Amino acid sequence: MNFDMSKLVQQAQKMQEQMKKAQQERENMEVIGESGAGLVTVTMTGKYDVKSVSIDNSLMSEDKEILEDLIAAAVNSAVKKVEENSTASSDIYKMAKDAGIDLPSGINFPFK
């Protein structure tokens, strides 16, 4: 078996660059979660920071608990969208494959 250390280092550097790019894309991402057929919307970044909450005026006369439930549902919707759009584990597998590294399946990466 011919082992080329410089090739392995180059592959690792390429994978590291791709991971940094994927992380930056996630941090710059914005998603909108909604509930109540769009009456409550939450804008969230890929870092899970809530940028804005919008509540339709028609809900202002509703019961406080209903409004709280709709806000919670909109936040949860936004969180789910961030997670769906940031497939860290599958990105790592793809990057490794592109770099010629065969990772075993079933590894749970901690940065999802």
Swiss-Prot record:
Which UniProt keywords are present, listed alphabetically?
A: Cytoplasm, DNA-binding
Q: Which GO terms describe its cellular component?
A: bacterial nucleoid; cytosol
In terms of Pfam families, this protein maps to:
YbaB_DNA_bd
Listed GO MF terms = DNA binding
Where it sits in the cell: the answer is: Cytoplasm, Nucleoid
Q: Which residues form the signal peptide?
A: none
InterPro entries per the record? YbaB-like_sf (IPR036894), YbaB/EbfC (IPR004401)
Q: Transmembrane region positions?
A: none
Key word Cytoplasm present: yes
Complex and partners: Homodimer.
- What function does the entry list? Binds to DNA and alters its conformation. May be involved in regulation of gene expression, nucleoid organization and DNA protection.
What name does the UniProt record give this protein? Nucleoid-associated protein FTM_1023
